A protein has these predicted regions:
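Ligand-binding face of N-terminal immunoglobulin V-set domains in extracellular IgSF glycoproteins
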Residues: 67-173
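Aromatic-Pro/Gly-enriched surface loop or interdomain linker
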Residues: 88-93, 97-101, 108, 113-114, ...
């Protein structure tokens, strides 16, 4: 369902990440050419690579109502698997995995594609009338991505793309960590704020029931 007040996860957080790229020094051609030299931060190296045009990876508003989902964990370590629970009325679709970054101003780079289990209509989400909580943890896993041990940490998203002859796509954001790395810079996402404004099911911490807003929200709901 769509409501007048909506919250789009990649604004403004991703704009900050894309502009900064988490690599502060030099942005010119010479800097990009040296970004993958020995002893250079792997994030600077990754962000110097060619990206995917925004027109290819972006979606309009909340994305397609026929493809909505969330990750079972908002954050995974390299080498772990991120699972996606997706409610879909599309007869076929694919899951493209992107990493956010500078990438020559493109904002994201396609990492890989994952084939989902197939069309999957999920059951109604669980709800709690006294608090307004909407929790879709009862959905089944639809697709998974084993994160390579060589993956570069950052904000990623799964782009759900219809392949049944009808256009439509949606995003599922998640974070890839590298718990073995060391850095003088730490980036913290605003994921608790994302969920506070998430109105999937009709409620958020600012609108809905039982008293004009919910008292509890869940990460287990459409992003």
């Amino acid at each position: 369902m769509r409501y007048l007040r909506t919250f789009r996860w990649h604004s403004p957080l991703v704009l900050t990440l894309v502009v900064a790229g988490l690599s502060l020094p030099g942005a010119g051609p010479a800097a990009a050419a040296d970004a993958c030299a020995p002893l250079i931060n792997p994030i600077a190296c990754e962000n110097s690579k060619p990206g995917t045009p925004k027109a290819t990876w972006d979606v309009s508003g909340l994305g397609s109502a026929a493809l909505q989902g969330f990750p079972t964990q908002i954050s995974v370590n390299v080498g772990e698997t991120v699972n996606f629970k997706i409610d879909s009325s599309a007869t076929s679709y694919r899951v493209d995995i992107y990493r956010m970054g500078y990438y020559g101003g493109n904002g994201a780079r396609l990492i890989t594609s994952v084939n989902p289990a197939g069309r999957q209509s999920q059951p109604g989400c669980l709800s709690q009338a006294s608090t307004g909580l909407v929790d879709c943890g009862n959905w089944a896993v639809s697709a998974s991505w084993p994160v390579p041990s060589t993956a570069v940490s950052g904000i990623y998203f799964a782009r759900l793309v219809r392949t049944d002859g009808t256009s439509g796509a949606s995003h599922i954001p998640f974070v890839v960590r590298d718990d073995s790395s060391h850095s003088g810079v730490v980036f913290q996402t605003s994921d608790s704020t994302w969920q506070a404004y998430n109105q999937y099911g009709g409620n958020s911490l600012y609108v809905g029931s039982p008293a004009g807003r919910a008292y509890k929200v869940s990460y287990k709901a459409r992003c």
